[in-house]
Amino acid sequence: MHTKTLKELSALLHSKQISATELAQLFLDRIAQSDLNAFLHVDPALTLKEAALADQRLASGDTTVLTGIPIAHKDIFVTRDWRSTAGSKMLENYVSPFDATVVEQFKQAGMVHLGKLNCDEFAMGSSNENSYFGAVKNPWDKAAIPGGSSGGSAAAIAARLTPASTATDTGGSIRQPAALCGVTGIKPTYGSVSRFGMIAFASSLDQGGPIAKTAEDCGLLLNAMTGFDPRDSTSIERDKEDFTRDLNQPLQGLKIGLPREYFGAGLAADVEQAVRAALKEYEKLGATLVDISLPKTELSIPTYYVIAPAEASSNLSRFDGVRYGYRAKDYTDLSDMYRKTRAEGFGEEVKRRILVGAYVLSHGYYDAYYLQAQKIRRLIAQDFQQAFTQCDVIMGPVCPTVAWDLGDKADDPIANYLADIFTLSTSLAGLPGMSIPCGFGQGEKNSKRPVGLQIIGNYFAEAKLLNVAHQYQQATDWHLRQPAE
């Protein structure tokens, strides 16, 4: 049962072959037996209460395709009645008085909430080792990282602890863990999914999206997640669309752009081999490969690591111990309380980024760093628009290597940042991008570690990306592979 797709589970629920309560209990049992640290907060009583409501809806016929199906939320989305920690000591015991819009949308669809998923603190990280509550283990090899910041979301899908999960992507945090855990994830166009109730890291980059087993599953989840929200000032007003409408379109005549910058030095041989094999499969499906250039790719890391920390330093200034969250125990005056609360409440990586952000926004450095980074960001977006005059979608690796061992890069933040080289540009441009499993590379002691293929589209081309991914998944079985229990 735990290996079935959302469509298969929906058919079983609607034909009364299984109840929402039975399905929820099945996944709760799997979560209880897991040692991956993917979940931060599980409350079986709350889950089973929601499952009972879903069963009532199924009995009355007031349903959607998602009614009764379990889902778990990245602990960046606030949830009423559940702790919302953002993986930080600062919010260790925080319970939100309201649900994030995304959580609300899935409740309205009748989905059943299984629990909150582990992530890097305030979504800052590429390995899920920055969580105050401990690292998440990769289900394919427990010595390896799952990727970040949505490591819990990807690991939980790979280990079949939930059939659906929410995640967020600021610079690659949906695509990279999906790739390293061998599952499917999509970051939609910036502004497509409401950020209301999504704990902010970098507001001009943060975007919610789903992680699941298949492209079709992601499309069904995206149908519920997207839509205009007046409570989010960056939400885009567009008609609702069915992202699964074009899944079965043939790929004959599709032009796939291959950026030469994505296949150069630094790309591991086993990753390149898996990606090239996937591209050959696309040629068999009728697609044509086109050589393109994204010349500003190498500037994406310095650009991102100026803009994102600048926005984070502003967003995280609200966590000061006054209104909610952690407060230092011993202090002499208000300034001392601010200082100690933030020093004790934030982890090392978060403090590092706040310092960088405050520096690049400070008098005398704003023009030299922040303003320059925004100019480069615009040029990166222009590179993509130029590329899309030559091709329909862009493909390449998600990450230069397979998942590395836990602790390998823990003391080297720059090495972690470099792992995002292929995902940052898409985020800076606000484009949709996804990762699908396309093979395995070599880990330590000959372990198999997944490789992801990145597919990037033009603005609002999610249906096209899902079609391109689905056709590949119909021809291959990488997305069906799962780690040993």
Curated annotation (Swiss-Prot):
One of its GO terms (cellular component) is glutamyl-tRNA(Gln) amidotransferase complex. One of its GO terms (molecular function) is ATP binding. Pfam families: Amidase. One of its GO terms (biological process) is translation. It is an enzyme of class 6 (ligase). Keywords: ATP-binding, Ligase, Nucleotide-binding, Protein biosynthesis. Heterotrimer of A, B and C subunits. This is Glutamyl-tRNA(Gln) amidotransferase subunit A. It comes from Janthinobacterium sp. (strain Marseille). The gene is gatA.
